[in-house]
């Protein structure tokens, strides 16, 4: 099955259309080296948003069955369905947010995903949980996680250019590894899911505030040259 899917996908692939090269004074204006990017506050804002999405998604994915049995009191067989729900929501997030990223500003797509994840995390924290609300809540978190992973490379290129994307996104992608252990560390320090959910909820609020206010960096030298 996997081989058929890979071959089928490969047959559908096409080369991207050639883009005209930029010339003149504006050529390379939006391209930042890694060192230049890391001196911009926008870089660390994007890094924090990515870390938050990964931390929330990976933590919920890792402990979904435990949450179902410990907080919702579901039996083991029903709790195991969380894996299926997360997989479907993750894939849906990749498809939906990926398609939207070609039709609207990518930072707004990230904002949309954050709102969805915030709703899911709020449900886990504040709503009376039953089977339906639990599965809906973890689906919201997984939806944002999958969509963010898909959209973020292009979002980083929007802010810092394509020439050094591998380096610029590579450092931000460290948030995937860091986020994968942060939730577990917090849970082990404070014991249980509640404190971890509160931290993730707070980080989602901060990330949402960032995504609604962040602006692309501007090179001051070019600004003075144009004046």
Describe the role of every protein-language-model region.
Residues 159-192:
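A late C-terminal transmembrane helix in Major Facilitator Superfamily
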Residues 35-99:
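Extracytoplasmic gate region of multi-pass secondary transporters
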Residues 1-11, 195-213:
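Symmetry-related core transmembrane helices of the 12-TM Major Facilitator Superfamily/SLC fold
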Residues 147-160:
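Intracellular juxtamembrane helix-capping segments at the cytosolic ends
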Residues 74-83, 130, 134, 165, ...:
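Juxtamembrane helix-start elements in MFS-like secondary transporters
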Residues 94-105, 191:
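Helix-to-loop junctions at the C-terminal end of transmembrane segments
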Residues 14-32, 220-226:
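Flexible cytoplasmic inter-helical loops of multi-pass small-molecule transporters
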Residues 108-123:
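Structural signature of the two symmetry-related core transmembrane helices
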């Amino acid at each position: 099955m996997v081989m058929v899917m890979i071959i089928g996908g490969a047959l559908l692939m096409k080369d991207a259309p050639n883009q005209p090269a930029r010339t003149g004074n504006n050529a390379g204006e939006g391209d930042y080296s890694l060192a230049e990017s890391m001196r911009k506050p926008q870089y660390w804002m994007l890094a924090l948003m990515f870390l938050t999405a990964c931390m929330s998604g990976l933590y919920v994915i890792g402990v979904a069955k435990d949450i179902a049995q410990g907080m919702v009191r579901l039996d083991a067989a029903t709790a195991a369905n969380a894996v299926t729900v997360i997989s479907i929501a993750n894939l849906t997030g990749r498809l939906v947010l990926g398609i939207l990223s070609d039709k609207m500003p990518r930072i707004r797509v990230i904002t949309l995903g954050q709102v969805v994840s915030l709703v899911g995390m709020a449900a886990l924290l504040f709503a009376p949980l039953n089977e339906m609300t639990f599965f809906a809540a973890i689906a919201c978190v997984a939806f944002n996680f999958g969509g963010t992973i898909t959209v973020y490379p292009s979002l980083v290129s929007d802010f810092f250019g394509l020439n050094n994307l591998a380096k610029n996104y590579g450092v931000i992608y460290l948030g995937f590894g860091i986020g994968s252990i942060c939730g577990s560390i917090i849970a082990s320090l404070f014991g249980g899911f509640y404190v971890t959910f509160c931290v993730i909820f707070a980080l989602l609020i901060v990330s949402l505030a960032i995504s609604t206010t962040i602006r692309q960096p501007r090179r001051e030298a070019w600004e003075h040259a144009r004046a």
